Amino acid sequence: MSLLTEVETYVLSIVPSGPLKAEIAQRLEDVFAGKNTDLEALMEWLKTRPILSPLTKGILGFVFTLTVPSERGLQRRRFVQNALNGNGDPNNMDKAVKLYRKIKREITFHGAKEIALSYSAGALASCMGLIYNRMGAVTTEVAFGLVCATCEQIADSQHRSHRQMVTTTNPLIRHENRMVLASTTAKAMEQMAGSSERAAEAMEVASQARQMVQAMRTIGTHPSSSAGLKDDLLENLQAYQKRMGVQMQRFK
């Protein structure tokens, strides 16, 4: 896996799924391929994106700044600086300085990532802030190692909370989760349908699922009543994909 592929993988792992994720993936690919060289416009676009947490925006802004060539005097962006200040916690800043002293002696991506993984996400963000604010200088490879370690820490905590939700025994949460997933799957079916001859069929299935979820939410139902809804819809989606010759490797 090339360095930039690895960076893209880690960064996208902390972006919530949805159309915005696809848009960000495209922007990252363009930046890494040298096709997007307008850092100012890129940062303005990033700043106004909805849904993303300030820290995710800060990390993306840091990656764009590292990758897109720009004039030396280009102003640093406040939204990135605020996101990478370790929540203003002096403890994070102390650790960030210690981490910076260690990684500036490193020259490889993996070496820097290995060292960085033993620090908290707050300390890692502060360390990125030092580099972003030009208070410290490291090679691009080392900076990318820092980025990937931060994303790994964030993705780990997201995974833990996701696993807690998936394995929860609370029937109300499980019921709501199944309905949300059914709605999302319906949306995916509508997006995939496009203008193919089977589009009407896909739209019909998706529309029925949406109506079912809406009815369940409106009148209130027993928590176990949604159990088959998501599975039926996923089955329909997978059967539809096969007929269309589309194969998603993993769809949950």
From Swiss-Prot:
Span list, region Membrane-binding: 1-164
Lipid bilayer topology: Peripheral membrane protein
Subcellular location: Virion membrane; Host nucleus
Transmembrane segments: none
Segments of this protein annotated with the region RNP-binding: 165-252
GO MF term list: RNA binding; structural constituent of virion
Residue ranges annotated as motif Nuclear localization signal: 101-105
GO BP term, pick one: viral budding from plasma membrane
Any one Gene Ontology cellular component term annotated for this protein: membrane
Assigned keywords, A-Z: Host nucleus, Membrane, RNA-binding, Viral matrix protein, Virion
Family: Belongs to the influenza viruses Matrix protein M1 family.
Note in the entry: Most abundant protein in virion. When expressed alone can form virus-like particles in transfected cells.
Function in brief: Plays critical roles in virus replication, from virus entry and uncoating to assembly and budding of the virus particle. M1 binding to ribonucleocapsids (RNPs) in nucleus seems to inhibit viral transcription. Interaction of viral NEP with M1-RNP is thought to promote nuclear export of the complex, which is targeted to the virion assembly site at the apical plasma membrane in polarized epithelial cells. Interactions with NA and HA may bring M1, a non-raft-associated protein, into lipid rafts. Forms a continuous shell on the inner side of the lipid bilayer in virion, where it binds the RNP.
Subunit and interaction comment: Homodimer and homomultimer. Interacts with NEP. Binds ribonucleocapsid by both interacting with genomic RNA and NP protein. May interact with HA and NA. Cannot bind NP without genomic RNA.
Protein name: Matrix protein 1
